[in-house]
């Protein structure tokens, strides 16, 4: 099974999918930034397989994603939906593979939930690997106020990102 997990309020509606099965899914925004703030945008990023951190049994390894996923590349695609955010697009790598998506222009109140649809492709575990399951951790930012990294605060954005030593998993910003 391929899966994603985050210990937070923003998550995937379907956190676990069966190997070889394509599925419709949603990034679920569980709340806004509080204090009357509205979520105006979201950015979601999938592992790109280029500089992704790969762990085996919780220990970082020099293996690459393709050592464990036979059909890596372009497994996810944004599903067009303007019901909450009127502007959206996919993020692509130089080869045109979808590595994430963004939405903006919304005004999701703190007491609402929002669903951002995408299609999760049918990942296939590399038969030559020892893997019996693969977990993909995604990075999600719910944005309430546009700011630079120095201005990051809970009242401006909510981050649910893997803690990999980047500027986006800093203290108090929910790196997991």
Q: Would you name each region that the model predicts?
A:
Residues 22, 113, 131-133:
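Extracellular Ig-like/FN3 beta-sandwich strand-entry sites
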Residues 14, 103, 138-140:
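Surface-exposed beta-strand edges and flanking loops
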Residues 26-30, 119-126, 133, 139:
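Extracytosolic low-complexity repeat regions of secreted or lipid-anchored proteins
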Residues 7-49:
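N-terminal segment immediately downstream of the Sec signal-peptide cleavage site
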